[in-house]
Amino acid sequence: MKDEIISYRQMCDAEKVQTLQRGMNYRLNANYSVILMSQRHNAPYKDRVLSDGMTIEYEGHDIPKTSSDIDPKQHNQPQTTISGKLTQNGLFASAVEDYKLGKRKPEIVRAYEKIFSGVWSEKGFFNLIDYKYITINKRKVFRFFLEETEIDFNAAGIIENKLRQRTRIIPSEIKKIVWERDEGCCVICGATDELHFDHDLPYSKGGASITPDNVRILCARHNLQKSDKIE
């Protein structure tokens, strides 16, 4: 669920895997791909949310560090392996190219973000719509662009719900402030499980997610009660 606060173990369980070791996971299951992102100061890649509040710019991944004398940041991010097989970068880029040629719909990607050590938040589902392969600091890097979408699960898998209103992404720095301010628990009952970052005032009613004053932590029960009152 979007903006749900979860542990690493809960994230893996949600995706029905033992571990998630890669940041990019093309078609982790039959329905969608998965990315792990971070905007922390020590993050290895430059991921960010664009100013529209609904688009993620996600950096591709470096070559593996196979020995101590290899610095991945001095090498181009690869599209293929030495044997010619597509890397995760290549798989994501190929999906974009096929989408642009009208061969397929955009790849659906589920995004999770690391907030603190051991604390993750689901950012929701996105359409993978574009990429660039650009030169930065004398090497080539991938930049993937993902646009937020609303998804419903059904017996056949997943379906895009274009009738549901999209909501802007709560910035990571706001989540960090709110987590510390609310001490990692529901502000109403003090629960410490099934937590969500909640827009205190919905966007449709004039709320914004750019300040901590409009975001709080709620448990699933109180988040549902609030939704019922709004509707």
Segments (PLM) and residue ranges:
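A structural signal for short, well-ordered beta-strand segments and their strand-loop junctions
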Residues: 111, 187-188
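Compact mixed alphabeta submodule
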Residues: 114-162
